[in-house]
Amino acid sequence: MNLLRPKLKYFILAILIIAADLYTKYLANTYLEFAQSVKITSFFNLTLLYNHGAAFSLLSNDQTSWQMIMFSTISLIAAIVLIYLIIKQPITEKINLFSFALILGGALGNFYDRAFQGYVIDFLDFHIGNYHWPSFNIADSAITCGVVILIAASLFTKKKS
């Protein structure tokens, strides 16, 4: 356990992301009407949607049980791999650890939805005029931020020789 103590904060970050994700999805599901936009700004709405597909609602028209099982399994495998990476990553690799924690929290937040509801709740709707970015949630944001940070770190940090 002493080996994991320095990495505990990264697991706590993942748990906080899961909690924020599930709580905001609960609020959206409780207070928003399905597919009815609530205008917040000229470029941002809250719009409750149920995503039966993958990221950006890919494959969402084909709502089959194999698809739910496949996406749930992929999320669970990703979470297991991320936990392993956090455990094995040197404590000095803080950017990687932070990124892995973001992705882990997001993967588990969306896994929960898929496993217990059969779909992921999306509600954040950004747009320019009539062009809407696909709706998303806190988990999606955490995953995206984690991946972007990992890519940026790999591109802009020098490897020690």
UniProtKB/Swiss-Prot annotation:
Belongs to the peptidase A8 family. NCBIfam families: lspA. It is found in: Cell inner membrane. Pathway: Protein modification; lipoprotein biosynthesis (signal peptide cleavage). It catalyses: Release of signal peptides from bacterial membrane prolipoproteins. Hydrolyzes -Xaa-Yaa-Zaa-|-(S,diacylglyceryl)Cys-, in which Xaa is hydrophobic (preferably Leu), and Yaa (Ala or Ser) and Zaa (Gly or Ala) have small, neutral side chains. This is Lipoprotein signal peptidase. GO terms for biological process: proteolysis. It is a multi-pass membrane protein. It comes from Francisella tularensis subsp. novicida (strain U112). The active site is at 122, 140. Its EC number is 3.4.23.36. Its main location: membrane. This protein specifically catalyzes the removal of signal peptides from prolipoproteins. Keywords: Aspartyl protease, Cell inner membrane, Cell membrane, Hydrolase, Membrane, Protease, Transmembrane, Transmembrane helix. The chain crosses the membrane at residues 8-28, 40-60, 67-87, 91-111, 136-156. InterPro entries: Peptidase_A8. GO terms for molecular function: aspartic-type endopeptidase activity. One of its GO terms (cellular component) is plasma membrane.
